[in-house]
Amino acid sequence: MVKNKNESAILRYDILVLKRRGVTRDLPSGTESLQWVTNTATLIYGEHDAVVVDTFATIDQNQQLVDWITKSGKNLTTIYITHAHGDHSFGIKILLDRFPNARAVAVPAVVKAMQTQIDPNYIKNFWNKLFPDQIPEALIVPEALESNELELEGHKLVVLDNGFTDTEYSTSLYVPSIGLVVAGDAVYNGIHPYMPETTEQSRLNWIAALDRIEGLKPHAVVAGHKNPANDDNSRYLCLS
């Protein structure tokens, strides 16, 4: 059967989950399960092209991400960053060096917030102390999106504005054609949420954001941080 040239290919997704030490290092004994965390990168792909959602913090993990995308055989067109935290965005330059025809994008508020994350003093006093000699030296911010949509082989990928979840200007990426939400840090799956930036009011906003995502009735929800043994069932919206 010959596919009509106007017929869109079915989209699929795959995830790369990598484990690292958490940023809280002064936990008491008996809390070993809280001393590590994972990050998730998601590859949404069609017949030829792909979009990756989020990167990692360290040089080694971002190189693993590059190798994983390369192995997929897909043409990477876009790197979408859900929010400003460095553990989701420090790999932009590494990916663009390997995939120079791709573009890195985020909503304007995230682009602005990332300027603080890549400030040399902040890198020196926070990230380099936690991960010495592991953070990329060349850190860049993505381009600002002019709309709330991306396109992949004829399918819309819709940006969801979550407001404040575990940090300000949190977003997710919704793929209506396959019922997928790549949630970023709006959703945690079997991992203790990062709470230091939150307040009582922001946590209420977080709950409201989860309710909005649940209202989309997604088939799959990919958490920004997840236990690798868990699936991507939407029930984790209620467990975040």
Task: Describe the residue ranges of each PLM region.
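Active-site neighborhood of phospho(di)ester-bond hydrolases with catalytic His/Asp-centered motifs
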Residues: 53-56, 77-85, 105-108, 181-184, ...
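Active-site metal-binding motif and surrounding structural segment of the metallo-beta-lactamase
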Residues: 60-106
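Divalent-metal (often Zn2+) His-rich catalytic cores of metallo-beta-lactamase-fold enzymes
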Residues: 180, 202-240
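Pre-active-site segment of Zn-dependent metallo-hydrolases
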Residues: 31-38, 48-78
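Active-site environment of divalent metal-dependent phosphoester hydrolases
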Residues: 59-60, 84-89, 111-114, 166-168, ...
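Metallo-beta-lactamase
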Residues: 112-163, 167-169, 176-177, 210, ...
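Zn-dependent metallo-beta-lactamase
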Residues: 1-48
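Beta-strand-turn-beta hairpins that frame and shape the catalytic cleft
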Residues: 9-11, 45-50, 149-158, 175-180
